[in-house]
Regions:
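Catalytic loop of the DD-peptidase/beta-lactamase superfamily, centered on the K-T-G motif
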Residues: 2-43, 63, 88, 169, ...
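Active-site helix/loop module of the DD-peptidase/beta-lactamase fold
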Residues: 6, 53, 61, 74-125, ...
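Short, charged, amphipathic alpha-helices and their helix-cap/turn boundaries
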Residues: 26, 35-39, 129-166, 191-211
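A glycine-rich, coil/turn loop motif that links secondary-structure elements
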Residues: 99-107, 169-174, 250-251
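Short alpha-helical patches at coil-to-helix transitions and adjacent helical residues
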Residues: 62-68, 107-110, 173-178, 255-258
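Flexible glycine/proline-enriched surface loops and loop-helix/loop-strand junctions
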Residues: 51-54, 161-167, 178, 238-247
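Catalytic tyrosine of NAD(P)H-dependent dehydrogenase/reductases that use a Tyr as the general acid/base
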Residues: 57-60, 171
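The feature captures the short pre-catalytic strand/loop hairpin that immediately precedes
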Residues: 46, 151-163, 230-242
Length: 365
């Protein structure tokens, strides 16, 4: 059986095992093994034709590593410092809004924002299993076509939630913080978030051709088909992109582009200085998790990256709410990206299981 057939068998079995999953994409990039393969199983959309390899989709929070990378390029250029405060970087309405919610913006730094240690409440908290009455996700479901602004989402966090804790004392995953980083990128560069990331990461040099900020940047030419993603019975294609557009998410991409990005990032092919990647992958030292149990700590989180131990090797990457998982193993030069097309998979589904299985399928090459 060829390695492509092995990958195909894996996702065929996945789609068969999880009937709620409309389809699944899998891309494996391992240049040392002469592997650059994408396979698909299932359907393009519920009731539609077969899912096509290379399809595009909303990558949601997998946008965050792009945002962090672009921000660290600004640090290398001396245009911002990780120790600058929100009060300095976001003077004006955003600073005033955060202060009105009890946030000490002169104590919250860019570093805190990039490591989810700012203490700023996540406006999308109910999307991550913290069921809150009439939360942000519920509002989106009521009016999926609403055009959100970044300021609205920050205001939601301030008015709806309370600070997780003083900056630097707790890990609290925060789309709010990522949206603030997006605002900083736009202010410093004078560009849209998508254009700033494109230039600072240097998509052209990396061969990233089908990644863009949805509705803000022009769509690239020769657009691949859309892989429809779902929240329960709702096709999120009807959701205005602004629900997740300003830094916490916002990019549309493909598995292949994501594989090229994560491989280049963790092979240190984007930054100018070796210490930059070391800073980005410096993990937290057992900080307590906001809203977690009293003894729950986080030690695998870095700057918009997470470390995972899978199949006895170390991987770095990030997940996206709508079903994207993108991880790379720099010591083996293997990058694996999957998309399973929905946010609400049943209990027992493990995102990293396919990463492990695909990695094992490379054995013997």
């Amino acid at each position: 059986m060829s390695v492509e057939d092995r990958f195909q068998a894996l996702i065929d079995a996945d789609v068969a095992a999880w009937p709620d999953m409309p389809g699944r994409l899998l891309h494996v990039l391992a240049p040392g093994l002469d592997v650059d393969i994408e396979v698909a199983a299932g359907v393009q959309e519920v009731g539609g034709g077969p899912l096509q390899p290379g399809s595009r989709f909303r990558i949601a929070s997998v946008t965050k590593p792009f945002v962090a990378t672009a921000t660290l390029r600004l640090v290398e250029q001396g245009r911002v410092s990780l120790d600058q405060t929100v009060a300095e970087l976001l003077a004006g309405p955003y600073d005033e809004l955060l202060r009105s919610g009890g946030y000490e913006t002169d104590a919250i730094t860019l570093r805190h924002l990039l490591t989810h240690t700012s203490g700023i409440y996540d406006f999308a908290a109910d999307a991550y299993g913290q069921e809150l009455t009439d939360g942000f996700t519920a509002q989106v479901a009521k009016d999926p076509g609403h055009r959100w602004t970044r300021f609205e989402q920050i205001r939601w966090a301030v008015e709806y939630g309370k600070p997780y804790g003083p900056p630097g004392t707790v890990f609290g995953y925060s789309d709010t913080g990522a949206c603030l980083v997006g605002e900083i990128l736009e202010r410093v560069t004078g560009q849209s978030l998508g254009a700033a990331i494109r230039e600072l990461v240097d998509y052209e040099r990396l061969g990233i051709r089908t990644t863009w900020q949805e509705t803000i940047e022009d769509e690239p030419p020769d657009l691949p088909p859309l892989s429809h993603q779902y929240e329960r019975d709702l096709d999120i294609a009807v959701m205005d992109a602004s629900v997740d557009l300003y830094g916490g998410g916002g990019l549309m991409s493909t598995c292949g582009d994501l594989a090229r990005f994560f491989r280049a990032l963790l092979r240190d092919e984007i930054f100018e200085r070796p210490e930059t990647l070391a800073t980005m992958t410096d993990t937290l030292d057992g900080l307590p998790r906001a809203m977690g149990t009293s003894d729950e700590t986080v030690s695998n989180a870095a700057m918009y990256l997470f470390r995972a131990e899978v199949a006895d090797v170390t991987w770095w990457g990030h997940d996206g709410y709508w079903g994207t998982t993108a991880y790379t193993c720099p010591t083996r030069d293997v990058t694996i990206v999957t998309s399973h097309q929905r946010s609400d998979m049943p209990e027992g589904f493990k995102r990293m299981a396919l990463v492990a299985d695909a990695f094992v399928a490379l054995e013997g090459l």
